[in-house]
From Swiss-Prot:
Membrane topology: Multi-pass membrane protein
Protein name (Swiss-Prot/TrEMBL): Membrane protein insertase YidC
Broad class of the protein's primary localization: membrane
Compartments, as annotated in UniProt: Cell inner membrane
Quaternary structure, from the entry: Interacts with the Sec translocase complex via SecD. Specifically interacts with transmembrane segments of nascent integral membrane proteins during membrane integration.
Keywords: Cell inner membrane, Cell membrane, Chaperone, Membrane, Protein transport, Transmembrane, Transmembrane helix, Transport
Superkingdom in the source lineage: Bacteria
One Pfam match: 60KD_IMP
Organism from which the protein derives: Brucella suis biovar 1 (strain 1330)
Length: 610
């Protein structure tokens, strides 16, 4: 019975790891390749920009604004990018306001008051601080154009209201910093004056205060709209199923909406009307751009896909109509989040501005009730250790302590089973020809000795959701991105960069990706091998072969996992070996580890010739 239990545990673990390998290895591998291609393309564009900063081309944005203010904005940019432009050339096409904060740098395009030029100062493409800063938003005339825009929709009575082609006028300060907001104005032919004050904090939140002043002779009705628009699907978006990348939003009572790029291609348009409380945007793994309307007022939210001359993905919202009588004014405030999805920053924004479920901008996954607390625990310990890798080691010890009663009961049951081995062998020999009686006798023995043959499964089953949760923390939280451990591990969220097949860098050649078996995966495999050798070798040859090969298979499969996860697994195995040794010793059971290791190198005696 014990051998069957071990066999089933082995098969279950093998299936689990095969599934994990399919999801976590193939996806991140493709993502890494595409990310490298994207970095190389950006570097090529930067070099081209340095050679030709005077290049320019007209790429006007001409959305079709609806006549009915109750309608969501139309398709928007319908013109193709035209001749390829460098980023510098695209930015030089329009007058701009500089953005300079501790976290951001870039500019606001005065044509449309569009936020389409934004870099994240604190984050780089690679672990090197000398590598390029992360480019979040880009002008629409570029192939990967990505921007945020706020405007108005009106009718004949309102005249031309601010839209994507409106050129705003700057009043006073022309540099946006946390201490210096900027003011933009626009007056149309109906004597409607629009005054926009844009402010920004030290992190990633822009506040846009719009005032509409009616100096005309008739009452007007108009609505405020906002849109987050991205041209072309990012290369990394379909790399993995582990997290959501694409259009996202919270739509009041309808809750979180996650729309993959492929899904919106099929549906074209997904709308939510009369929403109170929520937000819309587009999210990547670590970064996002979102629009946040007043949380106590109705709005219409929409996710769209347009083809036209090039694919365009859009999350937008439309406010309820605003009525402005002659001589009166109306105000509306919207916010724009554009930056890194730092957990505490997102949580603080949700609390400060009462943004409905803004924390769901971070994809915590199915085990969010484990993943989120685990992140906060790791982050809290990090404040004392100053190293996320050490924090993971400490959390592993705490988890071992938390599940000690379960593990203790399991190991005690396993120890008693070892003590019962002589009786179990006797039963097998006695009923060798009658499997039914053999099983009945075994069950009676288990019941009499209070042994649970499946007790060893529980520590494994408990570890599975913890494994997934820790993987999710390492994979989606930006705090773990480029977080170093010690020595050669400079990014806990990336695989171990070394490989035994080039002697860990001593031999001057690049190893194929599937042979990148680093130091930590090897350490993990050794600890797994030792843990399995704590128990006697199964008498069945098939089971014995599986137990022998499992550590090797796990070593290859986990080599592509984040280094932080492999370190956790190796450390967890080490603690399990220590824990099991102590419990077995207390139960008076012989520890088989050294005998089993010696048995591997002991020559089997040859059968005597008859």
């Amino acid at each position: 019975m014990e051998n069957k239990r071990n066999f089933f545990i082995t098969i279950a673990l093998s299936i689990l790891i095969l599934a994990l390998w399919q999801v976590f290895y193939l996806g991140p591998k493709t993502e890494a390749q595409r990310e490298q291609a994207r970095i190389e393309e950006q570097q090529r564009q930067a070099q081209q920009a340095a050679q030709n900063r005077q290049a320019s081309s007209s790429t006007g944005d001409t959305p079709q604004m609806p006549a009915n203010p109750d309608s969501i904005p139309g398709q928007g940019d319908t013109k193709a990018a035209g001749a390829p432009l460098t980023r510098d050339a695209a930015i030089a096409q329009s007058p701009r306001i500089e953005i300079d904060t501790p976290s951001l740098r870039g500019s606001i395009n005065l044509t449309g008051a569009r936020l389409d030029d934004l870099y994240l100062k604190k984050y780089h493409e690679t672990v090197s601080d000398k590598s390029p800063e992360i480019e979040l938003l880009a002008p629409s005339s570029l192939k990967q154009g990505y921007f945020v825009e706020l405007g108005f929709t009106g009718n004949d009575a309102t005249g031309a209201v601010p839209g994507p082609n409106t050129v705003w006028v700057v009043e006073g300060n022309n540099k946006l910093t946390p201490s210096t907001p900027v003011t933009l104005t626009y007056t149309n032919d109906k004597n409607l004056t629009f005054k926009r004050v844009i402010s920004v904090d030290d992190a990633y939140m822009f506040t846009v205060d719009d005032t509409i002043i009616n100096n005309g002779g008739s009452t007007v009705s108009l609505a405020s709209y906002g849109r987050v628009t991205r041209f072309n699907q990012p290369e990394h978006a379909s790399a993995t199923y582990v997290l959501h990348e694409g259009l996202i939003g919270v739509m009041g009572q309808d809750g979180l909406q996650e729309i993959k790029y492929a899904k919106i291609k099929d549906n074209k348009d997904i709308s939510f009307k009369d929403v109170i409380g929520g937000w819309v945007g587009i999210t990547d793994k670590y970064w996002a751009a979102t629009l946040i309307p007043p949380q106590d007022e109705k709005f219409t939210g929409r996710f769209s896909h347009f083809t036209n001359d090039r694919p365009r993905y859009q999350s937008d919202l439309l406010s309820a109509p605003l009525t402005v009588a002659p001589g009166q004014s109306q105000k509306i405030q919207n916010r724009v989040f554009a930056g890194a999805k730092v957990v505490n920053t997102i949580q603080n924004y949700e609390t400060k501005y009462h943004i409905k479920q803004f924390d769901l901008l971070i994809d915590w996954g199915w085990f969010y009730f484990i993943t989120k607390p685990m992140f906060y625990l790791i982050d809290w310990i990090y404040k004392f250790t100053g190293n996320f890798g050490v924090a993971i080691l400490v959390v592993t010890v705490l988890l071992k302590a938390l599940f000690f009663p379960l593990a203790n009961k399991s190991y005690k049951s396993m120890a008693r089973m070892k003590l019962m081995q002589p009786k179990m062998t006797e039963i097998r020999e006695k009923y060798a020809d009658d499997k039914m009686k053999q099983q009945q006798a075994m069950m009676e023995l288990y019941k009499r000795e209070k042994i649970n043959p499946l007790a060893g499964c529980w520590p494994v089953l408990v570890q599975i959701p913890v494994f997934f949760a820790l993987y999710k923390v390492l994979y989606v939280t930006i705090e773990m991105r480029h977080a170093p451990f010690f020595g050669w591990i400079q990014d806990l969220a990336a695989p171990d960069p070394t490989s035994i097949f080039n002697l860990f860098g001593l031999l001057p050649y690049t190893v194929p990706h599937f042979l990148m078996i680093g130091v930590w995966p090897i350490i993990m495999g050794i600890t797994m091998f030792l843990q399995m050798r704590m128990n006697p070798t199964p008498p069945d040859p098939t089971q014995a072969a599986i137990f022998t090969w499992m550590p090797i298979i796990f070593t290859f499969m986990l080599a592509s996992f984040p280094a932080g996860l492999v370190i956790y697994w190796a450390w967890n195995n080490t603690l399990s070996i220590i824990q099991q040794s102590v419990i077995m010793k207390r139960q008076g059971v012989k520890i088989e580890l050294f005998d089993n290791l010696k048995g591997l190198f002991r020559r089997k005696p040859k059968e005597a010739n008859k």
